[in-house]
Amino acid sequence: MSVHVRYETPEDVSNKIYELVQACNGGRIKRGSNEVTKVALRKTAAFIVLAEDVNPPELVNHIQLICDDNSIPFGYVPSQEFLAKEAGMETGVKAASLAIMDVPKAAQEMLDEVLELI
C-alpha cells in the first residue's frame, strides 16, 4: 500500500468504483491531478477517484486533504492505467486521479452504493 493511501480498498469496492467511472463516462469527468485539484478547491466534484499506484505519491496527496476540508467523498482504485481505460482514455495513458462532476440518474444508485462501502 502506498504512502498516500489511507485505507486498503477491497477488490469488490474497487470494481464498483471502476463501474461507476464507466457509467459516468458520458457525463462530465475531469482527469489528471491539476484538473481534479481545481474542482476539489471549487467544491464542484461529486466524487473523486485516486489511483493507489501513483509514483511519486505527492502528485495526489494534497487532493485527499482538500476533499476532507470540502467534504468531497473520494475512493481509491489499484491501477492508474485501468482507471484511465475505464474513463475512456486512450490505451497506454494513465490517470492518477479523476473527478466525477455530474452523476447521471442511472448511475446515482451506484454512487450511493460506493459511498456506503467506503
Predicted features by range, described:
Residues A40, A45-A46, E52-Q64:
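Conserved P-loop NTPase motor cores
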